[in-house]
Amino acid sequence: MKETRRRKLWMLAAILIICCLLGFVWFQTKVVNTRADEEAVFIPQAPDYSDATMWVTANADAEGDGADIFYMVSTWEEDWTTEDGRVCHYADVWNVRHREHMAREINKVAAYMSHEHPESSENGDGKGKNRFHAPYYRHATIETFMMHSEDSIRSRTRLAMRDVCAAFDLFQAQRDTTRPLILAGFSQGGLAVVELLKHIDDETYRQLAAAYVLGYKVTPEDTLNCKHIKAAQGETDTGVTICYNTVKDVKYIQPVIAATCMGINPVNWRTDATPATLHDTITVTLSPEYHVLVVSGYSGAEYPAYKNFLNVGDIHSCEPWLYSECLAKNIRVRADAWRMKNPRQNNNP
């Protein structure tokens, strides 16, 4: 009896030892494979935001009565390979060609955000001029979003969001904080706006006139985890988030980008289904159920489909451009509304 029990104990001990050895071998193999994967992936050098090369800026606000705009560019790069064969999932801010790609969008946005379009100014008083800053950052490549995995997107974009927060902290430390603050971004830049709202402290939030999430989503989890994210309800409210995504029909919503819990029509600033007319021929209607803009009278043909992922019933690429006059005017309106609520700040240049 005792001998049988002793044998069972030895067998159990042997099994435990074998399991431990197998676990150790598995762990070592995983570590080796992980290191090999890391060595095969290239991470670009971090930006130095004290270097003017890392920024696009425009200062049209000579009078000092405008807003400070911090803009985050969208996704411009696909996965690419270094000369030594390593794949990279990020834009390289030290690569001149990559900066040129980002600058195409940034300069076009700066043209209307830093200086309100004259046709959108009702009284032609020349106001609506702003100070515009946009950092180059190591944005994740488009393949990140084409994986259709929220976990993968969150993991891959973590580096990009660190860059954005570092750039913003320097921008915030150097700017005149008595001026209204505008955050804006398109696509992955819209994601960056959401993450910045989580990053900023309450004092910085009090300086916020508005945050514009163009062509990206705000999730219920985002709103639960961040008291700074408050959906805009009209044209003049401040400290709010403006979010919109454009589709031809709600069936074309791209979930990883546009499955949002908030939305507003940037043409009439309504959150219901009241239609608005844009450029005389385009009808823009918000879907209160899906919080996206459904357009008719506009094909978006100038934006070809991208790998059956974007611009395939959605019109993702139009977001900063189709409504540019509406956005330029609204930035002015919300900045003025912020100044009305903060009169003690108004005498500062």
Residue ranges of model-derived segments:
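Flexible, membrane-associating and regulatory peripheral segments of lipid-active enzymes
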Residues: 2-113, 120-124
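Surface cap/lid and interfacial helix-loop subdomains adjacent to catalytic sites
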Residues: 5, 23-28, 35, 163-177, ...
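Active-site catalytic motif of lipid deacylating hydrolases and related acyltransferases
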Residues: 31-33, 72-179, 301-318, 324-349
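Loop/turn elements at helix/coil->beta-strand transitions in domains of secreted/extracellular proteins
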Residues: 65-67, 128-132, 177-180, 206-210
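Active-site-proximal beta-strand/loop segments in catalytic clefts of secreted hydrolases
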Residues: 72-75, 136-140, 186-187, 213-217, ...
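Flexible, glycine-rich phosphate/dinucleotide-binding loops
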Residues: 78, 141, 190, 220, ...
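A short acidic (Asp/Glu
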Residues: 81, 144-146, 192-197, 221-225
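Gly/Ala-rich beta-loop-alpha elbow adjacent to hydrolase catalytic centers
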Residues: 185-189, 193
